[in-house]
Regions:
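Polytopic transmembrane helical bundles with strong interfacial aromatic enrichment
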Residues: 1-126
């Protein structure tokens, strides 16, 4: 599937909806059910999830102005992968207590870093 402004903006909306819902779920439904360490893991997942959904919103907006910049599409895919792998694995660790799932988290972190690097490079060359 090709990443374009419409898809990036749609994914951003979906990811932000999910981040808000998961933040509320963690603050209310999980309150008292997770130990403090796992609560911190959950909060980190929500924070990185939301920030990078906003980054995806920004990239999607830039794609409206520069649709020919393929680097923007790559950055959008990298932020999408980062949210899925980084935040997704942290949510799973917090809910299950299976710390081994945390081995996935660095792959999401690398995707976030690569997304920011690609975005910076694309902007520099614009």
């Amino acid at each position: 599937m090709e990443m374009n402004a419409r898809l990036a903006l749609t994914l951003s909306g979906i990811f932000m909806f999910a981040a808000v819902a998961l933040g509320a779920f963690g603050a209310h439904a999980l309150k008292g059910h997770l130990d403090p360490d796992m609560t911190a893991v959950w909060q980190s997942a929500v924070q990185y999830h939301a920030w990078h959904a906003l980054a995806l919103l920004g990239v999607g907006s830039l794609m409206l102005h520069w649709p020919q910049k393929r680097g923007l599409a790559l950055a959008a895919w990298l932020f999408t992968a980062g949210i899925t792998l980084f935040a997704g694995s942290l949510y799973a660790v917090a809910l299950t207590g299976m710390r081994g799932l945390g081995m996935i988290t660095p792959f999401g972190g690398v995707a976030f870093l690569a997304g920011w690097a690609v975005l910076a490079w694309t902007a520099w060359r614009a």
